[in-house]
């Protein structure tokens, strides 16, 4: 979900849990494949999607005390809320002569981990 006018793109991690609990079992049942023949399930986040968790790996946004805290939710790769921090990082790298055009295309995007983490 994008918060209008903010550049934020957040998601509820319960979506992933619901897929594991409801959608996958239904898909397996409809497929006719025996669950004994399934050796694994892959899960992937687009780089860089961040899922903050507590010490028990519970997503922070699923805890009542954090529901209204945007930084507790999954930040999708398309989250641009850290553009200011990305600009600051790029300026510092430019001043220090550390921009690597081959690896980065010349700049750090607000979609990457470092600007999102720096914003905290």
Q: What is each residue range found by the language model?
A:
Residues 2-120:
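Glycine-rich phosphate-binding/catalytic subdomain of phosphoryl-transfer
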């Amino acid at each position: 979900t994008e918060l209008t006018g903010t550049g934020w793109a957040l998601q509820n991690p319960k979506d992933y849990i619901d897929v594991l609990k409801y959608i996958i079992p239904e898909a397996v049942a409809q497929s006719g494949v025996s669950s004994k023949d399934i050796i694994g399930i892959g899960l992937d986040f687009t780089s860089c999607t961040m899922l903050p968790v507590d010490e028990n790996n519970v997503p922070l946004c699923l805890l009542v005390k954090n529901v209204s805290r945007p930084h507790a939710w999954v930040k999708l790769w398309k989250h641009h809320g850290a553009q200011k921090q990305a600009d600051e990082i790029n300026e510092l790298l430019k001043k220090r002569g550390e921009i690597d055009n081959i690896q980065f295309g010349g700049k750090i995007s607000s979609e990457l981990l470092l600007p999102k983490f720096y914003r905290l």
